[in-house]
Each structure stands twice: as structure tokens, then as C-alpha cells.
């Protein structure tokens, strides 16, 4: 499954979060692949598109939960969303 993980860093945790990121590179845990990661310029917000198991997602979030406010939502591509929408509309 693919997930979009978003984060915000509180001002109190900003320095520690940046230091950890620079030291580790924030690799995805085993069972998870990073598809893309974006940082909003000039702010403490970012986006991490990953693919993997629920367990790997839980591990990823646990690794950063002490410094970041994290949210993860499952996401699908247009072709999957379109097929589901077509199926639902056909029932109505």
C-alpha cells in the first residue's frame, strides 16, 4: 500500500529533528520504500510518499514520533481511483 506521510516540526523540536535528518538521512525501514520526499521551503512541514506494509509504516512513524507531528493516509493513483469511481457510479 502507498501512504502519504505528512509532518510538522514544533519550534522546540526543530533543531533536534534537522540534526537527526542530517545524521541519518531518514531511511525508510525494512519493508518500506521511499517513493518521494518533499520539504516545504522556509517552514517546518513536509511530505513523504512511501510504499510498504502497515508494520513498516508503524515503525517509520515510531522512529520520528518523539520529534515530529505525523499523519499518514493511504493513497492511490488516478487509474485506481478512476476504476473505483466507475464501479460506484455503475451501482447508482
Show which residues each predicted segment covers:
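Short S/T/G/P-rich N-terminal loop/turn motif that feeds into the first structured element of a domain
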Residues: 1-45, 52-55, 76-92
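A common structural junction motif
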Residues: 25-26, 64-72
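A common structural microfeature
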Residues: 45-47, 69
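Short amphipathic alpha-helices within nucleic acid-binding modules
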Residues: 54-62
Amino acid at each position: 500500500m502507498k501512504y502519504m506521510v505528512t509532518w510538522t516540526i514544533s519550534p522546540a523540536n526543530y533543531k533536534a529533528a534537522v540534526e537527526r535528518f542530517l545524521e541519518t538521512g531518514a531511511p525508510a525501514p525494512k519493508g518500506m520504500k521511499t517513493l518521494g520526499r518533499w520539504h516545504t521551503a522556509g517552514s517546518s512541514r513536509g511530505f513523504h510518499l512511501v510504499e510498504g506494509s502497515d508494520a513498516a509504516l508503524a515503525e517509520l512513524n515510531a522512529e520520528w514520533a518523539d520529534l515530529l507531528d505525523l499523519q499518514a493516509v493511504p493513497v492511490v493513483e488516478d487509474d485506481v481511483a478512476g476504476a473505483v469511481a466507475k464501479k460506484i457510479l455503475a451501482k447508482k
